[in-house]
Amino acid sequence: MEKKKKLILFDFDSTLVNNETIDEIAREAGVEEEVKKITKEAMEGKLNFEQSLRKRVSLLKDLPIEKVEKAIKRITPTEGAEETIKELKNRGYVVAVVSGGFDIAVNKIKEKLGLDYAFANRLIVKDGKLTGDVEGEVLKENAKGEILEKIAKIEGINLEDTVAVGDGANDISMFKKAGLKIAFCAKPILKEKADICIEKRDLREILKYIK
């Protein structure tokens, strides 16, 4: 019998990878503390995601692209990520990542882990430097939920056969749409909306709960 096709959508920063991409880039720009403070408020749901992202990216203005690339080299997949994705694919899952962060980091991990889809925002670069602007389809509050629906539609998968894995407030919209909602080392605001909360920082833990 053919396996039923299902979909799993991962958040990127602090879920599929150990880092917060923007915090790593901010370290290169010497504005790490300011940016971290805004990231924390956004993940706790105290700030609108798009406003907070634009505010953080504006602090990166004039950073050379080489410094961005240096920061991205520090981004590492979460413990167990490679095994987990391999096993999910064996179980018939389409595996996707969606990030309010940046394609320059997300696409590297997509290739490394062999993901089927990756959605992220873009840092605008001019003359080899960041302009302090950002564009993309993961800026709005409900963007992740819309992307989950979009992939499910393309792949012909029912929403009840979808899983969302995330850690912060901007993952709420995909939790609202997904059949199974897994909070991974998450903030309290997301745990409230989850079916399952995992506290151990090892992605293999999710396999216990996924058919």
From Swiss-Prot:
Substrate binds at residues 20, 56, 99-100, 144, 170. GO terms for molecular function: L-phosphoserine phosphatase activity; magnesium ion binding. The active site is at 11 (nucleophile), 13 (proton donor). Mg(2+) binds at residues 11, 13, 167. Transmembrane segments: none annotated. Keywords: Amino-acid biosynthesis, Hydrolase, Magnesium, Metal-binding, Serine biosynthesis. Optimum pH is 7.5. Its cofactor is Mg(2+). Optimum temperature is 70 degrees Celsius. Binds 1 Mg(2+) ion per subunit. InterPro entries: HAD-like_SerB (IPR050582), HAD-like_sf (IPR036412), HAD_sf (IPR023214), PSP (IPR004469). It catalyses: O-phospho-L-serine + H2O = L-serine + phosphate; O-phospho-D-serine + H2O = D-serine + phosphate. Disulfide bonds: none annotated. Its EC number is 3.1.3.3. One of its GO terms (cellular component) is cytoplasm. Pathway: Amino-acid biosynthesis; L-serine biosynthesis; L-serine from 3-phospho-D-glycerate: step 3/3. One of its GO terms (biological process) is L-serine biosynthetic process. Belongs to the HAD-like hydrolase superfamily. SerB family. PANTHER family: PHOSPHOSERINE PHOSPHATASE (PTHR43344:SF2). This is Phosphoserine phosphatase. The lineage of its organism: Archaea, Methanobacteriati, Methanobacteriota, Methanomada group, Methanococci.
